[in-house]
Amino acid sequence: MAAMFNHPWPNLTLIYFFFIVVLPFQSLSQFDSPQNIETFFPISSLSPVPPPLLPPSSNPSPPSNNSSSSDKKTITKAVLITAASTLLVAGVFFFCLQRCIIARRRRDRVGPVRVENTLPPYPPPPMTSAAVTTTTLAREGFTRFGGVKGLILDENGLDVLYWRKLQSQRERSGSFRKQIVTGEEEDEKEVIYYKNKKKTEPVTEIPLLRGRSSTSHSVIHNEDHQPPPQVKQSEPTPPPPPPSIAVKQSAPTPSPPPPIKKGSSPSPPPPPPVKKVGALSSSASKPPPAPVRGASGGETSKQVKLKPLHWDKVNPDSDHSMVWDKIDRGSFSFDGDLMEALFGYVAVGKKSPEQGDEKNPKSTQIFILDPRKSQNTAIVLKSLGMTREELVESLIEGNDFVPDTLERLARIAPTKEEQSAILEFDGDTAKLADAETFLFHLLKSVPTAFTRLNAFLFRANYYPEMAHHSKCLQTLDLACKELRSRGLFVKLLEAILKAGNRMNAGTARGNAQAFNLTALLKLSDVKSVDGKTSLLNFVVEEVVRSEGKRCVMNRRSHSLTRSGSSNYNGGNSSLQVMSKEEQEKEYLKLGLPVVGGLSSEFSNVKKAACVDYETVVATCSALAVRAKDAKTVIGECEDGEGGRFVKTMMTFLDSVEEEVKIAKGEERKVMELVKRTTDYYQAGAVTKGKNPLHLFVIVRDFLAMVDKVCLDIMRNMQRRKVGSPISPSSQRNAVKFPVLPPNFMSDRAWSDSGGSDSDM
């Protein structure tokens, strides 16, 4: 009852009801007293004349009836007033009793408060009764502001806000409400639930995220994205509360600002079930369960879904040991948090352990170039192996660069618009990306840096290009000399011409004096009647046989100089003993090395076939144009930057002009020789629009076909030798296969003989 008299309005209410109750009882006592009942009889006249003496019959009957009816009405009124007064007194009694109960519940609600560290930084020791700190806060310890009554507690770095509203329609309605406490960095959230008046559950604090606590200046947000309809927008915001009382610290902690409604705040998960216990101390004695951690560090009870690794599972074999048996007992472990951040499907808000609470520096970088180009430029700059200062010094002094470094720098060269944008940047250069920072300082030091790099690149590429051009001209010159000096190739052309005229006899194609060399590539397409050989095989075999006879004649003429020589007599007798078939085989054996080595004698012709005519002709012109442009650009660098670079490059460009003129003269001579050689084999073949070097391509391909035919002839001879019976005379006069020269099966002829091992 003491809590009820703290407020003045209950006293006034009791006095008011006291007068209401007392006044009816006083009126009731007046009606019940017989002295207050008076009876008046009518008087006919005022004169004191005595009435006549009559017998007492029915005169007193009317007064008795009126008296009885008035008594009944009075009793009825008294009963009704008594009943109403009783009900009113009972209502006042129950109203006072209810107010006392409510006041007692409010004192119990803010009475014993248990402050615990819900998330200890290390595993806690076994709990004892003395280890739990319980602090009872008086009702006056709370600080009131507006309709909110609360207290800020700091639990070893974890800020908890205990608060409740009084005289609120939400509390009177008995419905639960949630409030979200969000820190400045949103690293953790706490959900505080109001309890219903009809229940006695304690306030539950649930940490939603692990980590360090936010500061005490937490902002309270409503959970609902939209305000409830019963709350008016014109409701004034309560002022900020004064500093609250710290429970475990002597210094007061600053109070949070008033609640701020944000529609974009994320909704917290549903609260865990709360045990229904009557006393607050019994429910607060048990701390809330800490979040469960997985076996591999960083894994929570609800694992984040990671990207799958597709493989085939293999069951270990228990019969013998395997490498997988030792893996389970290994000491290797990975960082689960980092793996989730790298390979998790939902990695928003995850921070790698290396970063901690630091902000990602890449998010604050300023990109002037395209982000992808900026990233590629940064990668190339890191791979150069030289600092910005070394690069600037080389550009100013004109030092030589490694060609690979120049090519990399040329690939990342920004356009003129990008260079202007970088130079016009006037902000904090520390916020620029790596590539933009490098380019900014480089262009500030040397505004014509990339112009100089192009000049260096031209100087680095000039000497290799000029050397390649000179080598191509030399190859063409030697190829023309080979085509004019090798008589065996001319002998092959003679055999083909005679065979063609024999086959084309009687037609318009017959009796030809020359033919286009493109027909050489079609000889293998002309097959014999039985399809076993071709015109090319026939012509090459005849030339081989002819060269073999020539070798025999050379031996015979060489032996005549040695008259009386036993070797000659023996050799002559051996040829006379041989049959015609054996002589043919001997001619083939002696002629194959001669014809088969023809392609090796045309080595420069085969090289000339690979020369690009357009490149050879355009090299000198391109070098002259680039030298002229470089001289113009370098002249612009002379004013502001100077250094040894300008003098060195000018000397180089002057020498380039002289060398290019000499190279152009050599080029004209060689191309004239190529034209004469082509006309030597086929007049009028070089026309406008055709490649003047096509002759070398035809000869190269034809020689490759001749080498292949020579290999086929050699294989056929080997098969005949293995299949024919050996006669005594052949045993006595066995002829060994001639020793072939090293260049017999060179180049393509050797590559085309891939199946020779299986046939032999």
Curated annotation (Swiss-Prot):
Q: Where is this region: Disordered?
A: 52-71, 204-313
| FH2 domain segment(s) | 296-732
Compartments it resides in? Cell membrane
Subunit note: Interacts with profilin.
- Protein encoded by which gene: FH8
Protein name listed in UniProt: Formin-like protein 8
Gene3D superfamilies the UniProt entry points to: Formin, FH2 domain (1.20.58.2220)
The membrane topology noted for this protein in its Swiss-Prot or TrEMBL record is: Single-pass membrane protein
Q: What does this protein do?
A: Might be involved in the organization and polarity of the actin cytoskeleton. Interacts with the barbed end of actin filaments and nucleates actin-filament polymerization in vitro.
Q: Kindly state which keywords UniProt assigns to this record, in alphabetical order.
A: Cell membrane, Membrane, Signal, Transmembrane, Transmembrane helix
The organism is Arabidopsis thaliana (Mouse-ear cress)
Q: Which InterPro entries match?
A: FH2_Formin (IPR015425), FH2_Formin_sf (IPR042201), Formin-like_plant (IPR027643)
Q: Which residues cross the membrane?
A: 78-98
